[in-house]
Amino acid sequence: MGHRIPEETIEAIRRGVDIVDVIGEYVQLKRQGRNYFGLCPFHGEKTPSFSVSPEKQIFHCFGCGAGGNAFTFLMDIEGIPFVEAAKRLAAKAGVDLSVYELDVRGRDDGQTDEAKAMTEAHALLKRFYHHLLVHTKEGQAALDYLQARGWTKETIDRFEIGYAPDAPDAAAKLLESHSFSLPVMEKAGLLTKKEDGRYVGRFRNRIMFPIHDHRGETVGFSGRLLGEGHPKYVNSPETPVFRKGAILYHFHAARVPIRKRQEALLVEGFADVISAAQAGIDYAIATMGTSLTEEQARILRPCDTITICYDGDRAGIEAAWAAAEQLSALGCRVKVASLPNGLDPDEYIRVYGGERFAGEAGCRRPLVAFKMAYLRRGKNLQHEGERLRYIDEALREIGKLSSPVEQDYYLRQLAEEFSLSLSALHEQLSRSQRERTKPREAPDGETARPMLAKKLLPAFQNAERLLLAHMMRSRDVALVVQERIGGRFNIEEHRALAAYIYAFYEEGHEADPGALISRIPGELQPLASDVSLLLIADDVSEQELEDYIRHVLNRPKWLMLKVKEQEKTEAERRKDFLTAARIAKEMIEMKKMLSSS
């Protein structure tokens, strides 16, 4: 068994690559001063807020908060585990990882031997089923069916479509011959166990569509029955390696085209993706016939534009609405392509051809236009009550638009269609927005978004951030802060980051923000990269350092002062003036101490 990659080897890889070169393969970067800037690949934006520091070998997006080092970037952009990212960067750095081959080849540090066996078994059966389909008489009927519906040999090979034979024990015999545990294969969803103890294949006499996770591992199948009968489709169950709601079909292959176009085409089924790809649309992915889950939506969040092209029937239109609501709530720009006659993308391509479908997908409507059309369905707009209800619902959707120009465009449409005053619609919209817009406290533990102007942060929070920035760049400052403050930072994330900084220097390292960030857990890396990019002087004066420390240590005292103020007010309300006077005296003493500290 291989060993984990030692810290010194990881450090050699980190020093052997330039993060600007690594990120430059994915993002167009332009130098501005000491750093490079570009459009963030993790969220859609028009103005570059993605910063790369060649000096510190880190990146940070001031728009969405993503941040880290070269390892983090590759893991996030490609959806790969740390060891795979290390392997790729080691090749660039000229660092030999052959001694650690087993660990590097393992796709996930935390993956169990059982889970690895499951993915290997899926890969074996995928090759077996594909071979049967394209190279044997047994699979000829299935191959004829696929080609009759318009899929070429190249498309069948590209999607590794296969055929599972009708023989009950074919899969079990193959897996057993390769030393796979049959009980584990049952747990993997590839076999079922009969009452007599025999194991038989879950998929029989079916056209097989392999399902890959976002790293390209085969983790499941969907099998379509060849001929008549029920059930028409049999799908892999939920297993340790397959969670349907966490995977978008074909995303592993479409990731690069999606990133290049900054657009994804979201469809419902396997056949829709395959037909779209054959038509030249290689940025299509599918929810595999289920409603879009929150996990799937978050996968698409970095994409600039998501075009939804679901089935044109009522169920498809309602599913498109639900998916659009979920994606737009995450800040995605959503458009909707509606196909005529209730057709789905696969049917449309078979009837009208791929070129015409590409045109339909290109003529997608903005989300608000789709929603306004959806809201009209089933309403008699000649009826005053239903007409007013439609206008009210449409105004709610228009009010969600951030662009005043877009708002005005749709308001004018409403005004013209229903002979309404534009000023009246503007007034109604403003009134609705005022009613909906109320101050909302962030949930517990939620930190301020990075785009928040730093000057709006409380003084103690700014002080903590600046202290952490100086600590990352100076061992001496870190030692002073450790002695004076220790773990008494007021914000939990700041306390955690400070603890890692203390440990970093205690291990004997010199100041190196990039090396430090590589040792920090992923959830803290965006904060660390953000803090390390703060514009601060190379040296901090004793007075400045003292001021920061004072702000941090005085924060609990100011909070206590507020508590005393509430206690005094409560005593006065009870007409307990003696207690109120005593508390007032305590408050005066506390304020004196705070002003002198």
UniProtKB/Swiss-Prot annotation:
SMART domains: TOPRIM (SM00493), ZnF_CHCC (SM00400). GO terms for cellular component: cytoplasm; DNA-directed RNA polymerase complex; primosome complex. It holds the Pfam family Zn_ribbon_DnaG. InterPro entries: DNA_heli_DnaB-like_N_sf (IPR036185), DNA_helicase_N/primase_C (IPR016136), DNA_primase_core_N_sf (IPR037068), DNA_primase_DnaB-bd (IPR019475), DNA_primase_DnaG (IPR006295), DNA_primase_Znf_CHC2 (IPR036977), DnaG_bac (IPR030846), DNAG_N (IPR013264). GO terms for molecular function: ATP binding; DNA binding; DNA helicase activity; DNA-directed RNA polymerase activity; zinc ion binding. Its EC number is 2.7.7.101. Its cofactor is Zn(2+); Mg(2+). Residues 429-447 have a biased composition (Basic and acidic residues). It catalyses: ssDNA + n NTP = ssDNA/pppN(pN)n-1 hybrid + (n-1) diphosphate. Mg(2+) 1 binds at residues 268, 311. Zn(2+) binds at residues 40, 43, 61, 64. NCBIfam families: dnaG (TIGR01391). This is DNA primase. It comes from Geobacillus stearothermophilus.
